[in-house]
From Swiss-Prot:
Taxonomic lineage: Eukaryota, Fungi, Dikarya, Ascomycota, Saccharomycotina
Record-given protein name: Glutamyl-tRNA(Gln) amidotransferase subunit F, mitochondrial
Gene designation per UniProt: GTF1
Function: Allows the formation of correctly charged Gln-tRNA(Gln) through the transamidation of misacylated Glu-tRNA(Gln) in the mitochondria. The reaction takes place in the presence of glutamine and ATP through an activated gamma-phospho-Glu-tRNA(Gln). Required for proper protein synthesis within the mitochondrion.
Keywords: ATP-binding, Ligase, Membrane, Mitochondrion, Mitochondrion inner membrane, Nucleotide-binding, Protein biosynthesis
Gene Ontology biological process terms, A to Z: glutaminyl-tRNAGln biosynthesis via transamidation; mitochondrial translation
Superkingdom of source: Eukaryota
GO cellular component: glutamyl-tRNA(Gln) amidotransferase complex; mitochondrial inner membrane; mitochondrion
Naturally occurring in which organism (per UniProt): Saccharomyces cerevisiae (strain ATCC 204508 / S288c) (Baker's yeast)
């Protein structure tokens, strides 16, 4: 689709772009679709539904097929969320939770094109095989960092204890009676 992508910084006054973020710039000439001419075209495009929630809610399925959570689980959820137990329609809440769980299960079962590629960037609660970060790797990573003068970063300019009322040898001084003797 794109020939190449590169990360670049857009510089303006003071070395920062107007929103302080990095921008992606395409060096290729990719065409996605017709260019929008005005805000009405954008609103029309965004208001057109691509898919309906009703497809995945299972409204046509009978309520007997749904497996509602137990009444004890619903009461526990109500207590944990701080909602009142008194006057709560437990049966209605069970059916709503069953429909929501059914919807979530159907979303998880939707086939995704290029699933091998998307698994690397999966944001679901999936265990990832990451390498453990230890103290030596952290120090090694810090040693390779350099300040960017274009962004106004100056090496050694920040002192953590600079605004502290009392400090000694670049450490904060905490007195025992600090919170006890407050007025």
């Amino acid at each position: 689709m794109y020939k190449t992508w590169r990360l670049c910084r857009t510089h303006t006054v003071g070395g920062l772009c107007h929103d302080g973020s990095h921008r992606f710039v395409s060096t290729g000439g990719a065409k996605i679709g017709k260019k929008f001419e005005n805000m009405n075209q954008i609103r029309d495009y965004l208001s057109r539904p691509v898919w309906s929630v009703h497809e995945y809610l299972g409204i046509n399925t009978k309520e007997e097929k749904l497996e509602p959570p137990s009444a004890e689980a619903v009461k526990k959820l109500l207590r944990l969320s701080g909602l009142p137990l008194e006057g709560a329609d437990i049966k209605e809440i069970q059916m709503r939770l069953a429909k929501q769980l059914s919807f979530i299960n159907k979303l998880h079962n939707i086939p995704v094109e290029g699933e091998k590629h998307t698994k690397e960037y999966d944001a679901r609660l999936v265990q990832r095989n990451t390498k453990q970060l230890n103290y030596t790797k952290l120090l090694e990573g810090i040693s390779h960092q350099k300040q960017d003068a274009e962004l106004g970063e100056v090496s050694g300019s920040w002192k953590a204890t600079g605004l502290a009322a009392e400090s000694k040898n670049a450490y904060f001084v905490v007195k025992e009676g600090l919170l006890k003797n407050r007025k």
